[in-house]
Amino acid sequence: MSHSDTVALRGLIFFAYHGYYAEERKIGNRYGVDIYVRTNLQQAGTHDRLKDTINYETLYAVAKEEMEKPAQLLEHLGERIVQQIFNKFASAARVKVVIRKYNPPIGGICHAAEIVLRRKRNE
């Protein structure tokens, strides 16, 4: 089975309470999330049925739910999102999640700090 097709959500924006420092988790910050799911979309393309694809409304709900739960590290937050996607979509073969924290507290000017996770099912 080919997994060269992708369903993606790009540019999701959340205000959330993540960070290593307690103050970050108290005052919050703006975050961006991109999600890419590799799957086979042939059945969805042929039969025009939502059940044959990765429902991007559900992808958004996964991201929103996980963004609402505070985490110290973006890496931990990203892993939670990836695992929820694999749990909800049996057809998801690979997942890429990008999370960016805008204006991170690093002692200088920085538009965003970003992590990129790429995971294959059963890795």
Predicted segments with their positions:
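N-terminal, polar/charged subdomain of small-to-medium soluble alpha/beta proteins
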Residues: 1-123
